[in-house]
UniProtKB/Swiss-Prot annotation:
Known function: Redox regulated molecular chaperone. Protects both thermally unfolding and oxidatively damaged proteins from irreversible aggregation. Plays an important role in the bacterial defense system toward oxidative stress.
GO terms under biological process: protein refolding
Matches recorded under InterPro entries: Heat_shock_Hsp33, Heat_shock_Hsp33_C, Heat_shock_Hsp33_N
Subcellular location: Cytoplasm
Gene it is expressed from: hslO
Protein name: 33 kDa chaperonin
Organism: Listeria monocytogenes serotype 4b (strain CLIP80459)
Lineage: Bacteria, Bacillati, Bacillota, Bacilli, Bacillales
Length: 294
């Protein structure tokens, strides 16, 4: 099944809800970055959370999320847009612990760390950026997105993200949900939401069992009849890197640096952090870039 995200209204229009299956997308990220179990779970959770923030944006806006904890994984970066295109990378892809956490799951908190920052940069188009930042309060990532939304954007939310990793480090299931309270929600509605959230199985297990974004939202809302589906968006790992973009980046280094690449290295190779695609530049190509540089 191809990955996709569903947006809906629930609780008599008092909550905006999102759910996504991201299994194939996170499989692609794992394959490109050769991530081990804990790094895979952390990257997959971050990418899925970023996907939800991207889905909140307007047509031409983009979101970049950076989670910088004090754990061995190091910084995790993901970006997404309103079209469901997502990419991401983790600084240390090879983190695996033989011991599980107290809940019997991969110890993502230990990998990410419990001290650090979650930063969100919104590219609003027209060269305008908005930056928000909150401390990491959990290291489990879903709770950190929840805290960011409540603190930085003043939106009471609940974010659940999960990745099920096989013993051979391949991805079995991935996805998540996000619920946001809208102004006017009554205490009764809040109580009902809390009851449904408590009864919800873990995200990765639901997806492993074949649940769809629609069926996850039905569980979240307390029934299919309580959902008003707004939009369904395909989700995929997409990177917009290109040789031309890297060429422009090399030009920005200046003539001295490019001359050094030509005379000392006799060429250059650039690798994209997000997708690991590599671009080779010959001496002749570097000479052309040298001519364009200042």
């Amino acid at each position: 099944m191809s990955d996709y995200l569903v947006k809906a209204l629930a609780y008599d229009g008092m909550a905006r809800v999102y759910a996504a299956v991201t299994t194939e997308t996170i499989k692609e990220a794992q394959r490109r970055h050769d991530t081990w179990s804990v790094s895979s779970a952390a990257l997959g959770r971050t990418m899925t959370g970023t996907l939800f923030l991207g889905a909140m944006q307007k047509e031409d806006q983009k979101i970049t999320v950076k989670i910088e904890g004090d754990g061995p994984i190091g910084p995790i970066v993901a970006d997404s847009n309103a079209q469901g295109q997502i990419r991401g990378y983790v600084t240390n892809p090879h983190v695996h612990f033989s011991e599980l956490n107290e809940a019997g799951k991969l110890d993502v908190r230990r990998g990410v760390g419990t001290s650090g920052m979650l930063s969100v940069v919104k590219d609003l188009g027209f060269g305008e950026n908005f930056t928000g930042q909150t401390p990491i309060i959990s290291g489990e990532i879903g709770e950190d997105f929840t805290y960011y939304l409540a603190t930085s954007e003043q939106i009471n939310s609940s974010v659940g993200v999960g990745v099920l990793v096989n013993p051979d480090d391949t991805i079995e299931a991935a996805g998540g949900f996000m619920l946001q309270l809208l102004p006017g929600a009554t205490d009764e509605i809040i109580d009902e939401i809390e009851k449904n959230l408590t009864a919800l199985p873990t995200v990765s297990r639901m997806i492993e069992a074949g649940e769809t974004p629609e069926s996850i939202l039905a569980k979240l809302a307390g029934g299919e009849d309580k959902l008003q589906i707004l939009e369904k968006i395909p989700v995929s790992f997409e990177c917009n890197c290109s040789k031309e973009r890297f060429g422009s980046a090399i030009i920005s280094l200046g003539k001295e640096e490019i001359r050094s690449m030509i005379e000392e290295d006799h060429g250059a190779e650039a690798e994209c952090h997000f997708c690991r695609n590599a671009y080779d530049f010959s001496e002749e190509e570097l000479e052309k870039l040298y001519d364009e540089a200042k």
